[in-house]
Amino acid sequence: MEREASSWGLESRDVHSPNAVGSPEGSLKDPAGNTSENEEGEISQREGNGDYEVEEIPFGLEPQSPEFEPQSPEFESQSPRFEPESPGFESRSPGFVPPSPEFAPRSPESDPQSPEFESQSPKYEPRSPGCHPRSPGCEPGSPRYEPKSPGYGSKSPEFESQSPGYESQSPGYEPQNSGDGVQNSEFKTHSPEFETQSSKFQEGAEMPLSPEEKNPLSISLGVHPLDSFTQGFGEQPTGALPPFDMPSGALLAAPQFEMLQNPLNLTGTLRGPGRRGGRARGGQGPRPNICGICGKSFGRGSTLIQHQRIHTGEKPYKCEVCSKAFSQSSDLIKHQRTHTGERPYKCPRCGKAFADSSYLLRHQRTHSGQKPYKCPHCGKAFGDSSYLLRHQRTHSHERPYSCPECGKCYSQNSSLRSHQRVHTGQRPFSCGICGKSFSQRSALIPHARSHAREKPFKCPECGKRFGQSSVLAIHARTHLPGRTYSCPDCGKTFNRSSTLIQHQRSHTGERPYRCAVCGKGFCRSSTLLQHHRVHSGERPYKCDDCGKAFSQSSDLIRHQRTHAAGRR
């Protein structure tokens, strides 16, 4: 049976007509009755402007074979998307021509009018509104109906149709590649009722995808693939690619893309989280780590952990020399420099070195005269914020640091630490010349000047010189009437308030400094230190003439007088 396409001038032949591909000789006759066959048995026919080739039917798959017999009860049409009863598909629409008697299935199950009928083609469903499978030129009997096409053919070994593809001949449909089945991006399978009944396409099997379904973006944007388009991983055209396999239950519809409101007009720079937890340079940026106690936020989680040690009192970093503990490793490194004597930060103007960079910055303000921190009460300015805080406590009389041993309070933490050495007897600062040790560094400096006979501090009133500035300040009060401290019990006057406090203990009997070994108490810390040497056997004061050592400086002075008397 022959039909003529309305617009293309191509002659469509039924697959099962005597002159079709099913002839025993494997030949195809043109309208003039001529037959052409190449060396390998492949048949080529030229009609109008179109060329197509039909492969030779393999042995055993002729239409006369029992597996391919349309009248056989086992035969079922193989197009799963060819459903005459689906909406929009009218089997009686104008232009519909029923298939030839040789092709029409005889069993009730294959009757197009039967409700149980389902087309078996696994890959073809026309989606274009203007192209129906039953429109002229779209019959299954067309020479271009080929289930064996790489993208749409049945994989069942019992059935292989030899036509090169199923191509609609309607004027609005234009095939992209006759050898690769339907290539137009408009002809995609969207039918949710798609159900494969072939034994090769049951649940869990694989079925091929068309090249357009491999590229969902071309579907969304309406881009039609070109015949000359090549894949990115090879130079062969799209039509020559092998079929893709995909699970049968997969959705073949193109995904929907949401258009951005402003996809290209971007401003600023987007930065991802880096080493510092996404915090931007300059201290600005997100601070996602929030302290659950005080609510302070931090850009890095490690900084939050360090901050929380303020609340918990945890000090995991311990000095191996003195066993002092710190909450941060940087504080431990700074502390260790007090034992090693390392001073890596040096002033470029005077050459003075410091163990901490903050001390160097503070020192450099002495050269520049810069004092940015001003007291709001008296207007006095300071070069460092810690000096200002210390000064402000003189106005508020605040003493937040108290000794746990004796309860004495101090306005500075450093003063409390120096005081606690009185109770522990610790004297970490020793003289390099005589070996004498001190609990405070400030006491070691004037002692070192005593060996050099250096007295850099001179009284402006009388010209007397002193080795310590504190001693000069005490002396200066003697020239200022009314700047003395008198005892309210006996009326005795003193130049220093600390001396008055020590004197008052003679009236009250208070002995706050107690020996940890024998329990003996003293009213002065210096007396307790001298007493500690009785238990330790320490003799830091050594005679330069005979080498004899003493535990107290007064004993050394008394001994040196014996040598002076002998020289006379």
Swiss-Prot record:
Function: Binds to mammalian-wide interspersed repeat (MIRs) sequences in euchromatin and promoter regions of genes at the consensus sequence 5'-GCTGTGTG-[N20]-CCTCTCTG-3', consisting of two anchor regions connected by a linker region; the linker region probably does not contribute to the binding specificity. Required for cell homeostasis. May be involved in transcriptional regulation.
C2H2-type zinc finger locations on the chain: 289-311, 317-339, 345-367, 373-395, 401-423, 429-451, 457-479, 485-507, 513-535, 541-563
Protein's cellular compartments: Nucleus; Chromosome
PTM-bearing positions, type Phosphothreonine: 35, 189, 312, 424
List of residues that carry Phosphoserine: 17, 23, 27, 36, 65, 72, 79, 86, 93, 100, 107, 114, 121, 128, 135, 149, 154, 191, 323, 327, 470
Protein name, UniProt field: Zinc finger protein 768
Gene3D superfamilies registered for this protein in UniProt: Classic Zinc Finger
Biased composition (Basic and acidic residues): 1-16
PTM section of the record: May be phosphorylated at residue 'Ser-5' of the tandem heptapeptide repeats in the N-terminus. Phosphorylation might be increased upon RAS pathway activation and negatively regulate protein stability.
GO molecular function terms noted in the UniProt entry: sequence-specific double-stranded DNA binding; zinc ion binding
One Pfam short name: RNA_pol_Rpb1_R
A cellular component annotation (GO) from this entry: chromosome
Complex formation: Interacts (via zinc-finger domains) with TP53 (via N-terminus); interaction might be facilitated by TP53 oligomerization state. Interacts with ELP3.
Region annotated Disordered, chain positions: 1-223, 228-247, 264-287
Biased composition regions of type Low complexity, renumbered to the chain: 62-80
Disulfide bond sites: none
PROSITE patterns for the chain: ZINC_FINGER_C2H2_1, ZINC_FINGER_C2H2_2
GO biological process, one term: transcription by RNA polymerase II
Record's compositionally biased regions (Polar residues): 110-122, 159-186
Modification sites for Phosphotyrosine: 152, 317
